[in-house]
């Protein structure tokens, strides 16, 4: 996050969006989760926030959260080292049985623009985006992690943006997604995409497939991402 935040284009923007479970890495195994999950009220997480506090743009990034005995696939909204909101993934895939599902769709305000969050597979369910739009949200942020086995990755390669476009057409919101890319050993690959769609479901900016990078887009008159 610090590396991307140091880029000149980042400092000129209002928001930086990162992928699902970005902080600790997306690995849904009991050993990984029990070792790296973070209580958001703990000193260990506060140290991370302190380190992020000099970053000017608002940050939205995925974390593996521990709350009591439960684990959540969570996205946090961080501004100047302070947690200003969080969203817990509501539609878990079968491989995420170690997580508890969230049950709320909170929104947050950024420079007068109401934003909401869906995490990855949430976008397969129209009600998740509609719950955000019903609260007046203009922007839907989608932290994602689509590192898949090779055959599945090929089958889904063009479907991710197609599904996101459906949510945009249904709600009239802007949509920004941050996804992973590259190969993990010889069995898995992530094609992303990391992209921004306007309310007409046009892709206005996208990181090239199999390229690690970022895009910058102006969303409406007052918010850039």
Task: Name each region found by the language model.
Residues 209-225:
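C-terminal appended segment following the main domain
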Residues 2-80, 147, 151-173:
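Cys-nucleophile CN-hydrolase/nitrilase-fold catalytic domain and related Cys-dependent amidase chemistry
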Residues 61-63, 74-77, 106, 178, ...:
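Short beta-strand scaffold segments in enzyme catalytic cores
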Residues 40, 66-148, 153-162, 166, ...:
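Active-site catalytic loop in hydrolytic enzyme cores
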Residues 58-62, 85-92, 175-179:
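Short Pro/Gly-enriched beta-strand edge/turn motifs at strand-loop
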Residues 19, 121, 178:
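Active-site flanking residues adjacent to catalytic metal/cofactor-binding acidic residues
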Residues 43-58, 124-213:
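CN hydrolase (nitrilase-like) catalytic-core segments centered on the catalytic cysteine
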């Amino acid at each position: 996050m610090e590396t991307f935040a140091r880029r000149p284009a980042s400092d000129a923007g209002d928001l930086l969006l990162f992928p699902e479970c970005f902080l600790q890495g997306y690995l849904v195994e009991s050993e990984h989760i029990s070792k790296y999950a973070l209580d958001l009220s703990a000193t260990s997480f506060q140290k991370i926030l302190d380190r992020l506090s000099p970053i000017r743009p608002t940050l939205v990034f995925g974390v593996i959260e521990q709350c009591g005995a439960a684990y959540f696939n969570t996205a946090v909204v961080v501004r100047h080292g302070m947690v200003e909101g969080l969203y817990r993934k509501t539609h878990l895939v079968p491989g995420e049985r170690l997580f508890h599902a969230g049950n709320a769709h909170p929104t947050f305000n950024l420079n007068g623009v109401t934003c909401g969050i869906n995490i990855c597979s949430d976008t397969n369910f129209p009600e998740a985006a509609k719950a955000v739009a019903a609260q007046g949200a203009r922007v839907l942020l989608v932290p994602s992690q689509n590192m898949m086995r090779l055959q599945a990755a090929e089958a889904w390669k063009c479907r991710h943006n197609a599904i996101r476009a459906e949510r945009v057409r249904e709600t009239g919101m802007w949509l920004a997604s941050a996804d992973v890319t590259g190969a993990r050993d010889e069995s898995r690959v992530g094609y992303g995409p990391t992209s921004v769609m306007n309310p007409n479901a046009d892709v206005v900016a996208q990181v090239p497939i199999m390229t690690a990078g970022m895009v910058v887009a102006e969303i409406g008159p007052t918010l850039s991402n």
